Amino acid sequence: MSPVTPIVFVVDDDISVRESLELLIRSVGWRVETFTSATDFLAHPRPTVPCCLVLDVSLPDLNGLELQQRLDDRRELPIVFITGHGDIPMSVRAMKAGATESLTKPFRDDALLNAIRSAELKTLRESYAALSRSAARR
C-alpha cells in the first residue's frame, strides 16, 4: 500500500499569491487545490479531505472568518489564515475561532510550510485518535 500524499486547499483571490503558494506547497511534495473565493470553495465538491486549509482573511465575497464559520461541520479541519494586513485583532479573532496559525504577508516560505506541517500533524493525530476509539469499541 502506497502512502497517501497530503493535499492542501488554498483560498485566495490574488492570482499571484495563489500561484506562488501552489508552487511552494508542491515543491515539498504535497498536492494543492486552489480556489479564487469563498463562494468558489463552498461550491466545489470535496471528495478529498485536505490536511489543511490555507485561507486568506480578505476575500471579496466573505472574509476568512465568515468562511470558517460556514465550515461548522468540518471544525476539525486545520486552518492557516494569511492576511495582507498587519491586523493583530483579526489574527487574534482567527486564533480564538480555531485557526491553527495566522501569518501576515509577506511571510517566509518556511513559516507557511511549518504551519502546514503542524496542521498535517494535527490531522494525523485526530485520525489516529478516531481509529483508536473505533477499534476500542469493537
Residue ranges and their predicted role:
Residues 5-17, 21-25, 53:
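Conserved acidic segment of CheY-like receiver
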Residues 43, 65-77, 93:
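Short amphipathic alpha-helix used as the core "switch/output" element in two-component signaling
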Residues 48-54, 59:
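Active-site beta3 strand of CheY-like receiver
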Residues 87-89, 103, 107-117:
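C-terminal output helix
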Residues 117-131:
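The C-terminal output helix
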